Amino acid sequence: MASFATHLVVVVTMLFVAMASAEMLQDVCVADLSNAVKVNGYTCKDSTQITPEDFYFKGLANIAATNTSTGSVVTGANVEKLPGLNTLGLSMSRIDYAPNGLNPPHVHPRASEIIFVLEGQLYVGFVTTAGKLIAKNLNKGDVFTFPKGLIHFQKNIANSPASVLAAFDSQLPGTQSLVASLFGALPDDILAKSFQLKHKQVKKIKLRYAPKK
C-alpha cells in the first residue's frame, strides 16, 4: 500500500506540472506574518531570520476529528501555516470526511483545486456559470479538479471514513462557503426575496450562522 509520503509527492507533482510559475526577484520571500502591512500578500521576512521551520508543516499527516455538523474537516497548509509558501503560488490541504460527511458547496476565489483520494468513495462536482453540474463518483487513487472560482463540493458516499489531499495554485486560495456566507452576512429581506422564504424561516436558518465581526 502506498505510503502517505508517496501520496503527498503525487499531489505536489501534479500541482507543479499544472501551475504557471510566477517569476520571483529573490530566492525566497518567507511571509512576515507579524507585519500588518500587506500589498497583495505578505511582506518578506528578513532573509537573515529565515529558518527551516518556515518551510515545514506536519499538520496534514494525521486524520482530523470529523464530529462536525457537516461531517468534514479541512486542514489547510497555506501561507498562514507555512510562511515559506509566500509568493510561490501553491498550497495544499487535507480534507477528512465522516461516513456520509459533506464538504458543503463553496468557492475558492483565488485558485483552482485538484484533489487526490487517499481513502474512501466520494461524489464530487462543480457547477459552471451556465448552471451545468459536472460531477463524478471517485474511489481511492482517483484525481479530480475544480476550476477557479466555481461552486464545488465533495460528499462521502460510503459508510466508512474518507480522506483527500488537495492542491491549489495559490498560496492563499481563500474559501467562501455559500450557505454560511449568505446567511451569516446578508440582510433578512434580501435572503427572503432571493430564496423565496418567509422571514421567520430566514431567521431560523440564520441562527446557525453567526455573522463575521
Swiss-Prot record:
Span of domain Cupin type-1: 58-203
Cellular localization per UniProt: Secreted, Extracellular space, Apoplast
Listed Gene3D superfamilies: Jelly Rolls
Signal peptide segment: 1-22
GO cellular component: apoplast
Pfam family, any one: Cupin_1
Keyword Transmembrane helix among record annotations: no
Secreted is among the record's keywords: yes
Matches recorded under PROSITE patterns: GERMIN
Chain positions recorded as Mn(2+) binding sites: H106, H108, E113, H152
GO MF terms held by the record: manganese ion binding
InterPro entries: Cupin_1, Germin, Germin_Mn-BS, RmlC-like_jellyroll, RmlC_Cupin_sf
Alphabetized SUPFAM superfamilies for the sequence: RmlC-like cupins
Keyword annotations of the record: Apoplast, Disulfide bond, Glycoprotein, Manganese, Metal-binding, Secreted, Signal
Disulphide bonds in the chain: C29-C44
Residues carrying a glycan: N67
Subunit structure: Oligomer (believed to be a pentamer but probably hexamer).
Family (UniProt): Belongs to the germin family.
Function: May play a role in plant defense. Probably has no oxalate oxidase activity even if the active site is conserved.
Name of the featured protein: Probable germin-like protein subfamily 2 member 5
